A protein has these predicted regions:
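Short beta-strand/loop motif that positions the catalytic acidic residue
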Residues: 217-220
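A conserved short beta-strand
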Residues: 191-201
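C-terminal catalytic histidine-bearing segment of alpha/beta-hydrolase fold enzymes
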Residues: 244-286
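Gly/Ala-rich beta-loop-alpha elbow adjacent to hydrolase catalytic centers
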Residues: 174-178, 182
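Bacterial signal peptide processing site
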Residues: 21-24
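Serine-hydrolase catalytic machinery in alpha/beta-hydrolase-like enzymes
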Residues: 29-47, 51, 63-161, 259-262
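Alpha/beta-hydrolase fold nucleophile elbow
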Residues: 164-175
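C-terminal motif of bacterial Sec signal peptides marking the signal peptidase cleavage site
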Residues: 16-19
Length: 286
């Protein structure tokens, strides 16, 4: 009988250990599972989701000149005072979700922002998002008439400058193709307060530089050889003309680091370049 009691007690003790072990393992498993679920949710959150979650007011406006009509995305800061304004010129993918999210982030920083969709109402498509894929949008970008692009930007400039929520001071920020257009627009519009060129090229003709009145600020990835090979010539032309051209090159970052550096899975150099460039941009816009 004593022997049976001893066996029974051993069985109960072993069962208790086994039960506690399972309970702790399950608790640890749930913690790990929850972390994986959180990380996955963050990684899967798209630019469209972030835009949808934004508390700021967004609206589409229809602008026109001559017989052309085009769309522009406007993002308002949360303030009761007039603010400085910014024109965002999209990259060669058109006014996609990322470009609109960037406009929203500038509004979060306190600026009234307009982002014209420069391929809207071209090739039978009302907006960039109506194109079949980024390649189709890119083809439409490179088919644009340069004079039409300038006219579109002029209309966007006047619209945002005259908005009652604007102080009338307007800066321009552009990326890739839009960065090159930003440099060019500084030649065509002497009223802009500053031009911010993200991995875009400068003009090839030195004579055009004479028309620039705003300071030009460049933001370049260290591994973007195609664009960076043009910096020295731009710097010389600007210096010879007595114009302001200041730039930073972010070591290890590639082309389009502002878009790629925003992604959850961004490589470290692109992420660091993204963060440094954001801080610099906001400091310069103040």
């Amino acid at each position: 009988m004593k022997h049976l009691n001893h066996v029974f007690l051993l069985f109960v003790f072993a069962f208790s250990l086994f039960s506690c072990g399972n309970k702790n393992d399950k608790k640890e498993y749930n913690k790990e599972e929850a972390q994986v679920e959180t990380d996955t949710t963050m990684a899967q959150k798209t630019e469209a989701d972030e835009l949808s979650d934004s508390p700021r007011h967004h609206e589409w406006v229809t602008l026109s000149h001559g017989e052309r009509e085009f769309q522009a995305f406007v993002a308002y800061p949360e303030t009761n005072e007039a603010t400085k304004s910014v024109i965002v010129i999209h990259e060669n993918r058109g006014l996609n979700d990322w470009a609109r999210l960037f406009a929203d982030k500038l509004a979060e920083a306190g600026y009234l922002v307009i982002a014209p969709d420069l391929i809207s109402n071209t090739q039978g498509k009302r907006r960039t998002t109506d194109f079949e894929n980024p390649d189709a949008a890119r083809d439409a970008i490179y088919a644009l008439d340069p004079e039409q692009v300038t006219a579109d930007l002029d209309v966007a400039f006047n619209y945002i400058k005259e908005d009652s929520a604007s102080t009338g001071e307007v800066a321009v920020v552009g990326f890739c193709w839009g960065g090159s257009q930003t440099f060019k627009y500084a030649i065509n519009n002497q009223e802009i307060s500053s031009a911010h060129v993200f991995y875009g090229t400068g003009p090839e003709e030195a004579s055009a530089i004479a028309n620039i009145s705003a300071p030009i600020y460049g933001y370049y990835g260290g591994d973007d050889n195609r664009v960076n090979s043009t910096i020295e010539a731009s710097e010389k032309m600007m210096e010879d003309a007595g114009k302001t051209y200041k730039y930073e090159i972010y070591e290890g970052a590639g082309h389009a680091f502002m878009r790629s550096g925003h992604q959850p899975e961004a490589e470290k150099p692109n992420k660091e370049a993204h963060d440094k460039a954001w801080k610099r941009l906001k400091d310069l816009l103040k």
